[in-house]
Curated annotation (Swiss-Prot):
This is Phosphoglucosamine mutase. GO terms for biological process: carbohydrate metabolic process; peptidoglycan biosynthetic process; UDP-N-acetylglucosamine biosynthetic process. It comes from Aeromonas salmonicida (strain A449). The keyword DNA-binding does not apply. The active site is at S101. The gene is glmM. It comes from the Bacteria.
């Protein structure tokens, strides 16, 4: 059954435009409350990032949940993975995050976690969607839910993050830059690393409601790289607006993406006997990651793009490490979802145990040049079914001879075909991508 409101990561859009309006979000809170109230504790946690619209949407959700008879526990600015963790520890029915992740301040979204800290099952999302088709019907006055604010949520999550780093190790002597993207980790991440012994230079920690992800954070890592070089730091780490993804920078200013972070974490787990199974990446994962893991004898599998699909495949295979090149890293031995701070701590653990700088740890993986070309096509057409396109793809794959990949996929949000080619030689890859793109254009 097709979804009307929920995407792969909740409900998202531009603030003030449907569905991110106060009236719809209030109804969403009520609908979620109706579905969740059939269970036990009738408590729901609400966290948000630092967007100015978060105040408005938090109040709307609170009103809707109260009308359905549920208690709203407000945590204020809190990373997405913190909401997932605290939902479990509070024994709540669900956790709700108000965030649009790495998007600009004028976007926002609502996403849900179930009682065990994982994404809501499809059947629960569909039940909420079904309730949205009904008029709001408030419970009796005596049954209305209350709202309370907890003041120690950040401290609880800081202690959890620190607990994922071995107690016999210390970050003493390490100088690092931490860029919080003016987002939800601003009052948490610097404290985690400082309390573990690191010297921390913090940037992107002055949110004003409008500057989230604005020239800082994991989607703008040049600011981090520049600060690492300026301060002669050992490394840097940057988070996105809601703290579920990261990128890192070594002491030379080289930007380390999610694929390289996966490699570092997996190799360290193998070296220390903690690796269970293999690693899950996505269709967009660099082939350099696959070959580097292959050299170590570590199995690698590709899921569809999206952390939801990565997690699904990890659970299917029983593997504990997975993620995306965008920096969503899932370490199931520690968390139930992507967690930027926890993933950074796994890399820092590898630095400590191997007694190597970050630049040395990532040197075992060489990324292949990867070229992406977007081709717009007319609605109703299917260029991917054209014989000429498939013949050109087959020809390119033959030329790559197993030392590269071709991926064609439709955008999920606009009429675009994304042509991705990767291989060992950049100019060759560019030429191949253009050849395929021309055939796609000719197909309609």
């Amino acid at each position: 059954m097709a979804r009307k409101y929920f995407g792969t990561d909740g409900v998202r859009g531009k603030v003030g435009e449907f569905p991110i309006t106060p009236d719809f979000v209030m109804k969403l809170g009520w609908a979620a409350g109706k579905v969740l109230s059939k269970k036990g504790t009738k408590k729901v946690l609400i966290g948000k990032d630092t967007r100015i619209s978060g105040y408005m949407l938090e109040s709307a959700l609170e009103a809707g949940l109260s009308a359905a008879g549920l208690k709203a526990i407000l945590m204020g600015p809190m990373p997405t993975p913190a909401v997932a963790y605290l939902t479990r520890t509070f024994r709540a029915e669900a956790g709700i995050v108000i965030s649009a992740s790495h998007n600009p301040f004028y976007d926002n979204g609502i996403k849900f976690f179930s009682a065990d800290g994982t994404k809501l099952p499809d059947d629960v999302e569909m039940a909420i969607e079904a309730e949205l088709d009904h008029e709001i019907k408030c419970v009796e006055s005596a049954d209305l839910g209350k709202a309370v604010r907890i003041e120690d949520a950040a401290g609880r999550y800081i202690e959890f993050c620190k607990s994922t780093f071995p107690s016999n190790l210390s970050l003493e002597g390490l100088k690092m830059v931490v860029d919080c993207g003016n987002g939800a980790t601003y009052h948490i991440a610097p404290s985690v690393f400082r309390e573990l012994g690191a010297e921390v230079i913090a940037i992107g920690c002055s949110p004003d409601g409008l500057n989230i992800n604005d020239g800082v954070g994991s989607t703008a890592p040049d600011a981090l790289a520049a600060k690492v070089l300026e301060c002669k730091a050992d490394l840097g780490v940057a988070f996105d607006g809601d703290g579920d993804r990261l990128v890192m920078v070594d002491h030379t200013g080289y930007i380390i993406d999610g694929d390289e972070i996966l490699y570092i974490i997996a190799r360290d787990a193998l070296r220390n006997g903690r690796l269970k199974g293999g690693v899950v990446g996505t269709l967009m994962a660099n082939m350099g990651l696959e070959l580097a893991l292959q050299t170590l004898g570590i199995p690698f599998a590709r899921a569809k793009v999206g952390d939801r699909y990565v997690l699904e495949m990890m659970n299917e295979k029983g593997w504990r490490i997975g993620g995306e090149n965008s920096g969503h890293i899932i370490c199931l031995d520690q968390t139930t979802t992507g967690d930027g701070i926890v993933a950074a701590l796994q890399v820092l653990m590898a630095i400590c145990t191997a007694e190597m700088p970050l630049a040395k740890l990532r040197s075992g993986m060489s990324k292949f040049p990867q070229v992406l070309v977007n081709v717009r096509f007319a609605e109703g057409k299917d260029p991917l079914a054209a014989d000429a396109v498939n013949q050109e793809v087959a020809k390119v794959e033959q030329e790559l001879a197993g030392r590269g990949r071709v991926l064609l996929r439709k955008s999920g949000t606009e009429p675009l075909i994304r042509v991705m080619v990767e291989g060992e030689h950049e100019q060759q890859v560019r030429d191949m991508a253009q050849r395929i793109a021309q055939q796609v254009e000719s197909a309609f």
